[in-house]
Amino acid sequence: MTRQSLWDVSDTDVEDGEIRINVGGFKRRLRSHTLLRFPETRLGRLLLCHSREAILELCDDYDDVQREFYFDRNPELFPYVLHFYHTGKLHVMAELCVFSFSQEIEYWGINEFFIDSCCSYSYHGRKVEPEQEKWDEQSDQESTTSSFDEILAFYNDASKFDGQPLGNFRRQLWLALDNPGYSVLSRVFSVLSILVVLGSIITMCLNSLPDFQIPDSQGNPGEDPRFEIVEHFGIAWFTFELVARFAVAPDFLKFFKNALNLIDLMSIVPFYITLVVNLVVESSPTLANLGRVAQVLRLMRIFRILKLARHSTGLRSLGATLKYSYKEVGLLLLYLSVGISIFSVVAYTIEKEENEGLATIPACWWWATVSMTTVGYGDVVPGTTAGKLTASACILAGILVVVLPITLIFNKFSHFYRRQKQLESAMRSCDFGDGMKEVPSVNLRDYYAHKVKSLMASLTNMSRSSPSELSLDDSLH
């Protein structure tokens, strides 16, 4: 194939080596050697075509007589393409849409690499900014959509009690158990639950003190009987909570898909497993090793602290923040991993002969981790001047690395906290019994959907407010 392959399809004299281009009515005559400077572009490949079929694959129409190639493209953008063929550089005017321009040069087979330096920074900045805004907007939209789904599911669950025996009574009991702050009864129940959780955690902590341990027949430390009474009362209360919520749940299958209910279940399962293991060990001494399993399960009591999430807006908001901020959290971990890897190797190279605590790279990982997170236990410290300078750089880098993603995560947290407060306020304001009496001729699902739409409007206005409106004191409640 030669550069004259195109001319073989026409009898017209081509000694001038020119072709005619018509782009949406914008006509120009171009010399072949100008186009062949860039053979990978659409017009450059057009000159190398040796059949009409190949030509029509690259343009929209072709006139054999006039040797005119027609392209159904935007004629206002083609002058920029034409300028590229003459100068080898692309320029982007400020009034142009960068995405339309990007699609246009992609059609002509021109790489963004040819954008001149005077326009490159502005072009790529304008192109990335909407994508970043779209990412943040999509993340907020997903979180807000989940709120709408959550409140709609709440109304749907409440409607399932209609027509059931004692339906209104069960609904009020369900609201009192599952929504702290819904009524006076729910507030009292919530306070009692919090006190029992805190009492159980405090008891577990005090039981680890030697002064409160009573040796058994074999001399092993055992629990104080008074603490066992508190523990058994706590288990009885937690079991009552779980059974009561399950008994009045509108959807039993959905009940076990709720993370808070799974936490309630996991808070009592270790106790009953431990009870069974102890009975088995007592009846069969050969299975004494199972006692270690019981000891491990007893340590799982600390997870009861998660039960407070049912009564704390801040904890639930934290959980939602971690769920929808996985990109920011991943970015934070990536930054820390890179910094730890670099500074641990540097510290190892400098201190391996002078400091036994930094004699291996894994040991330096620990040092770099506590330094970058600004914890600084002080168990391992560099001794040389170069090592101390490295430690200073590691700490400063850690501050910068941690602060940048934390700002994004806090903005997410403030958004979820305000949203959760709004949801709780909406749930507390619901009076299903009175509301249904006021609209006897309206379908219940339509009625609930109408309420959801009103809530959606308020949530949208709330999400547009500034994150700075949230005070640090409020986030702790």
Curated annotation (Swiss-Prot):
The gene is Kcns2. One of its GO terms (biological process) is regulation of potassium ion transmembrane transport. It is found in: Cell membrane. Residues 207-225, 281-290, 349-361, 382-388 are extracellular. This is Delayed-rectifier potassium channel regulatory subunit KCNS2. Potassium channel regulatory subunit that modulate the delayed rectifier voltage-gated potassium channel activity of KCNB1 and KCNB2 by altering their kinetics, expression levels, and shifting the half-inactivation potential to more polarized values. While it does not form functional channels on its own, it can form functional heterotetrameric channels with KCNB1 and KCNB2. Each regulatory subunit has unique regulatory properties that can lead to extensive inhibition, significant changes in kinetics, and/or substantial shifts in the voltage dependencies of the inactivation process. Disulfide bonds: none annotated. Coiled coil: none annotated. It comes from Mus musculus. Residues 362-373, 374-381 dip into the membrane without crossing it. Its main location: membrane. GO terms for molecular function: potassium channel regulator activity; voltage-gated potassium channel activity. SMART domains: BTB. InterPro entries: BTB/POZ_dom, Ion_trans_dom, K_chnl_volt-dep_Kv, K_chnl_volt-dep_Kv5/Kv9, SKP1/BTB/POZ_sf, T1-type_BTB, VG_K_chnl, Volt_channel_dom_sf. Residues 1-184, 249-259, 312-326, 418-477 are cytoplasmic. Heterotetramer with KCNB1 and KCNB2. Does not form homomultimers. Belongs to the potassium channel family. S (TC 1.A.1.2) subfamily. Kv9.2/KCNS2 sub-subfamily. Detected in brain, but not in the other tissues tested. Expression was highest in the olfactory bulb, cerebral cortex, hippocampus, habenula, basolateral amygdaloid nuclei and cerebellum. The chain crosses the membrane at residues 185-206, 226-248, 260-280, 291-311, 327-348, 389-417. It is a multi-pass membrane protein. It comes from the Eukaryota. The transmembrane segment S4 functions as a voltage-sensor and is characterized by a series of positively charged amino acids at every third position. Channel opening and closing is effected by a conformation change that affects the position and orientation of the voltage-sensor paddle formed by S3 and S4 within the membrane. A transmembrane electric field that is positive inside would push the positively charged S4 segment outwards, thereby opening the pore, while a field that is negative inside would pull the S4 segment inwards and close the pore. One of its GO terms (cellular component) is plasma membrane.
